[in-house]
A protein has these predicted regions:
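Active-site-proximal specificity loops/subdomain of glycosyltransferases
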Residues: 108-152
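Short, acidic, metal-binding catalytic loop of nucleotide-sugar glycosyltransferases
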Residues: 91-102
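C-terminal functional extensions of proteins
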Residues: 524-591
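Conserved catalytic core of nucleotide-sugar-dependent glycosyltransferases
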Residues: 161-242
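Electropositive, gly/pro-rich neighborhoods at or near active sites that engage anionic ligands
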Residues: 301-475
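Short beta-strand-to-loop acidic/aromatic patch adjacent to the donor-nucleotide binding site
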Residues: 151-164
Length: 591
């Protein structure tokens, strides 16, 4: 491997076979599991696998009546000092100039190039060069779309990408009517005489080299700030899927509908030594019609998951049907599995119960003073999964699941029911759409949370937190659950639980549904409320973000959300809402 300085860009000659082989196993197997999750994800891999990306399979598009707006291609052209690489880039530009279905090409360059440098014999009326004097960012693209008053279908593509006649199909994809973006996987062009011979880049099916949307989908100046990172930098494609998603775009990757071609036989890379854009990252695997359809219980698509949750809750409430939605927790899930096996008198199980008991007290607030108490906790925890129709589950490569792979499989195997993606509860990702909580319209909603005082102080300004009211026409009430985590004192968990359930029973006629955030008591409280004839949803720690009460976890993991929504109504929890030793709970993640 060697490096060289090229036109202010560091290029690296790489063994791409090695790079692809390091990643291909995960992408092939995760695609297989997404398409047909008929066995344990971990057994498929033979190990616990973690990915920093969320993975989903693209939905298919419908065919719409043709809307004949202009197709505008935006790229940044540059002159590479490696002749072979420069020839590849010139070839792509020439192909795009000759494409009769591309109406305009905007080149946002670091300098203005001559026709010879562009690889053109004569000036093309299609091309407009603008000297932006720097490497192109996605934010720049939106600025120039507005500045040039561009209207129509925008195709943003890397320099080494060219399109064929299938770009005409974009006019029947509904982009002008819907807030939707195509994030397209490429075909590899290696000098083939017939483009039909080019194959998809299935070694990394989650990558994108072109993004297509319509200017009717407005991106506000504040939203444009979310795209303030360079094109071509490592991770930019998966970051862009995430940003489009949280701005309300339905993301599609349909490479056989609209084809893009990658001309890169030189294998010169300009980003491998350039760091990586900070996450989160979304990987959208392509929809290919001749592959098995994704299992509808495992879409992991925030648009579809939010809508499915919204519709389920709305349907239940409209029919006055009592329901609960528990969730797979973390350390509590492990304890539920170990406690379930307690009667076997297995020494290994007994040792694990004893080993996990301190963490149960510290993180989940559950004091287990004997192995028999663990068995009782397990029975109550698992009863929630028996009583529900659906429950929340993590994607199996999630950072949380690596700590609970056995108990994760235990729940899925013993409760083969439809699931919601737990991250559908991240309400801040669904603000531009119809957040699932709006299905609660007009209901009496009980909020169970340790941040009762903080929430109560924001009821009258709740529509300012995200710019919409997450609980329209709702009558909100609040109750604080047992505060027994960290160094706070606690009685045995069942004593704390019984006392709290009596408090809930005494007010059961004052609410229609409860949203729960109460540590290790969450699933147990949901099950108990169901027995009272009340509905409940175990939302978990993220419930505090519904009221703009944030902690370290969201500052760390969701910086884009803060950039987009944070305002003077947001706050930390009140000092009185911190348990003793709160910093010992995942670094004080809730505070």
């Amino acid at each position: 491997m060697f490096t060289m300085k090229l036109n202010n860009r560091t290029a690296t000659k790489v063994n791409t076979e090695l790079v692809d082989n390091r990643s291909i196993d995960f992408y092939v197997k995760s695609r297989h599991w997404l398409s047909n999750p008929n066995k344990s994800f971990f057994k498929l891999f033979g190990q616990v696998v973690e990915s920093e990306n969320r993975h989903q399979i693209s939905p298919p598009s419908k065919v719409y009546d043709k809307v004949k707006d202009k197709v505008i291609l935006i790229q940044q052209f540059y002159v590479d000092k490696i002749p072979h690489r420069h020839t590849e880039n010139k070839f792509c530009l020439k192909q795009n100039v000759n494409n009769k279905f591309i109406d305009k090409i905007i080149l946002l360059n670091e300098e203005i190039y001559t026709n010879e440098q562009l690889g053109l014999k004569t000036q093309s009326s299609k091309i407009q060069q603008i000297n932006i004097k720097t490497r192109l960012t996605y934010k720049d693209v939106f600025y120039y779309i507005n500045n040039l008053n561009l209207k129509g279908y925008i195709v943003l593509a890397n320099t080494d990408i060219f399109l064929d006649d299938t770009i005409e199909r974009v006019k029947q994809t509904g982009l002008s009517q819907e807030r939707k973006v195509f994030c397209q996987l490429r075909h590899e062009y290696n000098g083939e005489k017939q483009l039909s011979s080019c194959t998809l880049h299935l070694n990394r099916p989650d990558t994108q080299d072109a993004w297509i949307w319509h200017t009717n989908s407005i991106v506000t100046p504040k939203q444009q700030e979310m795209f303030d990172y360079r094109m071509g930098k490592n991770g930019c494609d998966n970051k862009t899927v995430y940003v489009f998603s949280i701005l309300g775009f339905a993301c599609h990757n349909e490479p056989t509908i609209i084809k893009i071609y990658h001309n890169h036989t030189s294998q010169i890379r300009n980003y491998l030594n350039d760091g990586k854009i900070p996450g989160p990252y979304y990987s959208i695997h392509p929809f290919v019609s001749n592959m098995p359809p994704p299992n509808n219980l495992n879409t992991f698509d925030i648009v579809r998951e939010n809508q499915t949750l919204h519709n389920y809750v709305l349907g239940k409430l409209e029919k006055n049907q009592v329901f609960i939605i528990p969730r797979i927790a973390s350390v509590e899930n492990n304890m539920a599995m170990y406690g379930n096996y307690y009667n076997n008198q297995n020494k290994d199980i007994l040792n694990k119960i004893r080993a996990w008991a301190p963490t149960m007290k510290k993180n989940a607030g559950i004091l287990l003073n004997s192995e028999a108490a663990a068995a009782k906790y397990s029975k109550l925890y698992l009863s929630a999964f028996n009583k529900c129709e659906r429950y929340f589950s993590w994607e199996p490569w999630n950072n949380y699941v690596k700590h609970i792979p056995d108990s994760f499989d235990f729940i899925l195997a013993n409760f083969p029911k439809p699931k919601f993606d737990t991250l559908a509860l991240d309400i801040f990702h669904s603000i531009p759409r119809e957040p699932w909580t709006r299905a609660l319209r007009g209901k009496r909603v009980l909020i169970i949370s340790p941040f009762k005082e903080s929430f109560e102080s924001k009821v009258h300004i709740r529509e300012k937190i995200y710019g919409i009211d997450l609980f329209p026409d709702c009558e909100l009430s609040f109750i604080k659950p047992p505060q027994t985590q960290a160094d706070n004192p606690s009685r045995p968990f069942d004593v704390e639980l019984d006392e709290f359930m009596k408090r809930l029973y005494n007010i059961k006629d004052t609410f229609d549904i409860a949203l729960c955030s109460c540590g290790g008591y969450g699933n147990l409280v949901c099950a108990g409320l169901f027995d009272m004839g009340k509905s409940a949803i175990y939302v978990g720690g993220v419930l505090q973000m519904y009221f703009g009460v944030y902690g370290q976890r969201w500052l760390r993991d969701r910086p884009d959300v803060f950039k987009l929504y944070r305002n003077d109504t947001w706050s930390r929890p009140k000092p009185s809402e911190r348990p003793q030793g709160f910093a010992s709970i995942e670094g004080g993640c809730y505070w």
